[in-house]
Amino acid sequence: MPAIQSELDVNGEDFARNREAMLAAVAGFRELEQKVLDKAAEARPKFEKRGQLLPRERLALLLDPGAPFLELSSLAGYKLHDDKDGTQAGGGIIAGIGYIAGVRCLVSASNSAIKGGTISPTGLKKTLRLQQIAMENKLPVVTLTESGGANLNYAAEIFVEGARGFANQARISAMGIPQVTVVHGSSTAGGAYQLGLSDYVVVVRGKAKMFLAGPPLLKAATGEIASDEELGGAELHAQVAGTAEYLAENDADGVRLAREIVGMLPWNAQLPARPARSWREPLYPVEELLGVVPADPKKPYDVREIVARIADGSEFLDFKNEFDGQTVCGHLRIEGHACGLIGNNGPITPQGAAKAAQFIQLCEQSNTPLLFLHNTTGFMVGTESERQGVIKHGSKMIQAVANARVPKLTLVVGGSYGAGNYAMCGRGLDPRFIFAWPNSRTAVMGGAQAGKVLRIVTEEKHAKEGKEADPKMLDMLETVTAQKLDSQSTALYGTASLWDDGLVDPRDSRRLLGYLLDICAEAEARPLKGNSFGVARF
């Protein structure tokens, strides 16, 4: 394949300005992640007094040292619900994809160092997303749990949808994907069913507590008086009730047992041998990705400058470039994995939509994964665009994206507006994974445009009623609307709302995409031995 010849002036003022802005954006979200870590660390004395490890210490013992670990949705729920100061982001869950005894797994740990690991609406949403990732990518699930259960302040938002988590667990087991849970502390009410639906359960002696109704509720409901240990302690569940398969002496021992369980599973042995991969690094350093995207989002740039820094050897086979240059399609390899790319150089034209739809079908035909790089204001509007059939061709593109069965990866590197977000496989079109650069924006439209639209609509409404709208009121309406949409379109707002699986430093993009493509390739090759019911205890 031909190599892209970069035209980026890495010594120019624009590059320096772009780089500075991107570095500030990266530092901003890293600082927020550190605040969450610092908040959890404040609980260390309490955990040490109880003879327990902090959640991240448990996770560190669980994962293979030195192996890659991809944390997911670290800033989910940032400043939402009870997270007033931004130190409780993460949805009460630390989660990601990493290796345990050489097996790639989906791992999750209750962040009991913050609010006892109670489940918020964000925490539930994150849990459901993690389960979706496990099912789509055939990843064993290992959970380290210690949670006070649902945050009752949000019971109405959690209760009904919470059942999906249990249903997903049953389906994961029925698919033939193992689930291992270590109980480090309390896991009551709904949390108890999370354990019961796991295939392997490890309980920590003297710490694990599992029951449907705790001592206070039990006394209120039935008059029975029992201690939490008598009601649902680790020994009861391991020796009498049979809910647990293994009894651990402490946190570290529980994690050790989880590693041994995963290690004894013939998970990797069931995977057909795959050819060894080799690749060449891009001709241009990934460090330069910091300066590719203009600090001013209104300035255009060529998405191929990003491709040149993530593709093996910077090689890219451009598809129908002469037909439409604003929607870029073509073939490349990332760390040896072939994939088809769709990127934006501005709005999606009718021709670009038709081109992309055709390219997606070709990738589906050849079983080639798809990568979407977002930087679009949406579909081209206007009378000429309508005459050219933008609705017809745009619908065709969305139809192709929605029905493509090959793995789809999405990386938002700039703007992602309107139906362009849908056509480029945004969250609602179910990409296998979706990540965003910290400079990116996602919204139905720009704030300024939204403000002007509401102003015009309000003026016309008053005119129909024979009235004249107050100019000051219109100014305020336009300003407030623009500010609201702008604040809700930032990368931070999007990741807090779980519109993506996390923010990524542009310099890590190539490594991230290579890792994700490898996960997808392994999932496509892996056979599963499922059943119609899952594994139940008798």
Residue ranges and their predicted role:
Residues 1-538:
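Ligand-binding clefts of soluble mixed alpha/beta catalytic domains
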